[in-house]
Amino acid sequence: MEEVVVPRHGDHHNINIKYGFFIFALTIIQTIFFLQVKFIQIKRWNSTGRFSKFWSQITNPPIWLMVTVWLLIVIFTGGHKISDFSEEYIISAKRYGRMAYCLIPLNIYLVLRPTNSPLLKPGYYLENMSLHKWTSRIIVFCSTIHAAGYVYKWIKEGAILNKPFRFLNLLGVVVFVFLVVLAIISIRPFRRKVYSTFYLIHNVTAWSMVILITFHARPGVTVFAVISLILLGYQLYLRYYSSYMVNSLKVIDIPTSTLQIIKIPQSNKFPNWLPGSHIRLNYTISKFKSWTTASHPFTVVTIPEDSTNNLTLIVRKPNSFVINPLDSYLVTGPYPSLAPPFFTTANIVNIICGGSGISLGLPIYHHFKSINSTVPVKLVWTIRNQNDTFIMNQLDMTGVQVYVTSIGDTNSEQQENQQQAVPLFVIEEEEEEQGHGLLNNDNENGIELQNMPKTNEESSEANSTNSKNNKDNQERKEYFKFGRPKFDEVFAIDDPTTTYDLDNSWVIACGPDELISDAKRWSKDRGYRFYYEKYEM
């Protein structure tokens, strides 16, 4: 027989409903606020012709500040009007459970990816990823307090072997177990090693929490459940039904390189995109993998002005995303990285990229060279494997400064052994022994830009042209240097007498943490604006 809660707790049964609506109202206010300030930031940037650091900081406040504010809110709300915690702890425990559920719509919203939305905050969904991770942790925090309160209560009552297994209670136990497993596997080292498992557990947990807690929660949470389901449905729509189907993908590489060039036929309906934008590639809806694995983001190297029929990508060699030229795939996007006013207001642009990070720098470089040639723009690309320079034969890299940082035999295995010993960058006149060893984990840093293996047919083609590529490799040596670039040298202003508006002077970095850190420090020392992307999961 089910426990009758109302007579036992009186009006305490419904006392927490208002706190759930309070938390949900705050999430709505936050969402509207950031939508508005992002829109204002871009409009003001367009109208004034100057980047505003103030509006940028309002649009993207420090993550520690956002997390601290939310933690203070949930802690204060969880203990509000609790006069005797030893007697009323269960009221607080229930409240934390309700607050956790009322944060779910915000957490889903933060990972929505509307395409081609350069004026909207969600259009730059990568900006929301850190907040999504920390909101998830706050949900786990609230859920843990909720669970701990009930475990304590059941132990006191001597019902710990009974009540957790009542059907409605068991639904909550199941969801909490999922949350604990997700919290553990989402720790960065685990997540990187078993990302596909993490992704599957993440989705199962999200759907389970939305659906099962609808029945578990007493009083009900129907309003929040409906909103969450609508958002999840919209997420599926964006992933599958607003996508473009493509086939006949082409892979270009050489066996000794760590990079590949991927060419994707461009759909006639695919919209124009800003330089540096990325797409996401997924299996078709009929494939089981499309439901159990994440879609894969890739930065588009080509720009609309190239007038090609392909979307060209530069990616690292494959590990999990297998491309079959006979299969069809879904492409979603484009998703902008830099806001539109950047391309019309920048008056000096310095770009530093490591490894596959060239995929961000090259289209921005090409844009200014071909569309806005009055803007001084420089691009530095650092690689460890000399054979990666084969892409210089496939793409226009005129004027790009290329540095090979692994010195010695070009054999990829030997270069791999040398990687840990070669520091890559010198900022001003730092001691060599203080080098930061950048790019030591190039494939581990940045948004999850997974790479794709070549097919047997493409492998055969690559082998047949390997000798030609080796010859080309020797010819390319005159276009790149060995060693470490110095920022002050590679980004030296051509005309020292020229002064630039620092609000519109930029440094852009794409690569691993150390590269980004050094570029940011150099940029800050000179008062430049700074933008970066790091490729990781």
Curated annotation (Swiss-Prot):
Specify whether Transmembrane is a keyword of the entry.
Answer: yes
Q: Where is the FAD-binding FR-type domain?
A: 187-363
Q: What is its EC number?
A: 1.16.1.-
Tell me what topology the record assigns in the membrane.
Multi-pass membrane protein
Q: Does the keyword Electron transport apply?
A: yes
Instruction: Report which superkingdom the organism of origin falls in.
Output: Eukaryota
The record's principal subcellular location, in a coarse class, is membrane
* Keyword list, A-Z: Electron transport, FAD, Flavoprotein, Ion transport, Membrane, NADP, Oxidoreductase, Transmembrane, Transmembrane helix, Transport
Q: List the disulfide bonds.
A: none
- Region described as Disordered: spans on this chain: 432-475
Cell compartments where the protein resides:
Membrane
What InterPro entries does this protein's entry cite? FAD-bd_8, Fe3_Rdtase_TM_dom, Fe_red_NAD-bd_6, FNR_nucleotide-bd, RBOH/FRE
**What residue stretches are annotated with the Ferric oxidoreductase domain?**
97-213
Q: What CDD domains would the database entry show?
A: NOX_Duox_like_FAD_NADP (cd06186)
Q: What function is annotated for this protein?
A: Probable cell surface metalloreductase. May be involved in iron or copper homeostasis.
Q: Which family does it belong to?
A: Belongs to the ferric reductase (FRE) family. AIM14 subfamily.
Protein name in UniProt: Probable metalloreductase AIM14
Lineage of this protein's species? Eukaryota, Fungi, Dikarya, Ascomycota, Saccharomycotina
